[in-house]
């Protein structure tokens, strides 16, 4: 079956959990979390869960695993904590949970960021994607620009297709 055929069979609506990772954001100031919600809704997807967690490995893992265990969540989208500072532990937290890494997500995100957005600073991004069982997790930087780029160029065009692939036998 071709990629085109897979995409035709893919679900049009995917159920998502948004996790913002920040020591300072609130629901009122979480611009990237709000942007994720808007972009998903505009694309016909549903946000079934949203939370803000602190920049610590245990809190991040608990939030991601809570999404994994929910029947009304197909995808967990995290934003924040993907840089190289001491407090940036999202990648360490999420990668330890992944069964399979979607290596192309991070590679393409950095390439597009380099070419279309922030130039050589793209090398500082540690965005990651992968699967836990039949769920997919994408971890992207916390800036609204990075979220918009990741969602519009990579995640939204493939969200239904990825979900379809994870449920094939």
From Swiss-Prot:
Any single Pfam family the record assigns to this protein: MoCF_biosynth
Database matches in PROSITE patterns: MOCF_BIOSYNTHESIS_1
Gene3D superfamilies: MoaB/Mog-like domain
Keywords, in A-Z order: Molybdenum cofactor biosynthesis
GO cellular component, one term: cytosol
Entry annotated with the keyword ATP-binding: no
Record-stated family: Belongs to the MoaB/Mog family.
Source organism: Bacillus anthracis
Keyword Transmembrane helix among record annotations: no
One record GO biological process: Mo-molybdopterin cofactor biosynthetic process
Record pathway: Cofactor biosynthesis; molybdopterin biosynthesis
InterPro entries: MoaB, MoaB/Mog-like_dom_sf, MoaB/Mog_dom, MoCF_biosynth_CS
The protein, known as: Molybdenum cofactor biosynthesis protein B
Function according to Swiss-Prot or TrEMBL: May be involved in the biosynthesis of molybdopterin.
SMART domains with a match to the protein in the record: MoCF_biosynth
